[in-house]
């Protein structure tokens, strides 16, 4: 007999979306918001360079992130998965549409959906 899964124990996946959009900034705000429960397994999905680039522009330091390969490897706190590394465009600029950024967003969404269906 299969045991029931406690939904409170499951990781929560959050995709960064387009690296040139507001997704990375929202992720950073989530990480810095003290009202967000630190007792959950939050898994951010995207390209780490996008998060680092946005933190640099905002002038903030990222909190420690647990870099993982699979959602089931997540721990309580902030986790990060790069499903497929998409190289940062040479002329990357926040707020501008770029093919590589769209590809990065799609990779993150596909990975997140597959994780939900597993």
Predicted regions and their residues:
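Contiguous, glycine/small-aliphatic-enriched amphipathic segments in soluble metabolic enzymes
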Residues: 1-118
């Amino acid at each position: 007999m299969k045991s029931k899964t406690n939904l409170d124990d499951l990781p929560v996946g959050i995709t960064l979306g387009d690296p040139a959009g507001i997704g990375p900034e929202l992720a950073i705000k989530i990480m810095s918001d003290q009202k967000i429960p630190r007792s959950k397994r939050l898994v951010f999905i995207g390209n780490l360079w996008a998060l680092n680039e946005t933190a640099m522009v905002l002038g903030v330091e990222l909190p420690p992130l647990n870099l993982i390969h699979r959602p089931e490897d997540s721990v309580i706190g902030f986790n990060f998965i790069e499903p497929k590394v998409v190289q940062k465009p040479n002329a990357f600029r926040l707020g501008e549409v770029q093919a590589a950024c769209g590809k990065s967003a799609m990779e993150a969404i596909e990975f997140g959906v597959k994780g939900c269906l597993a």
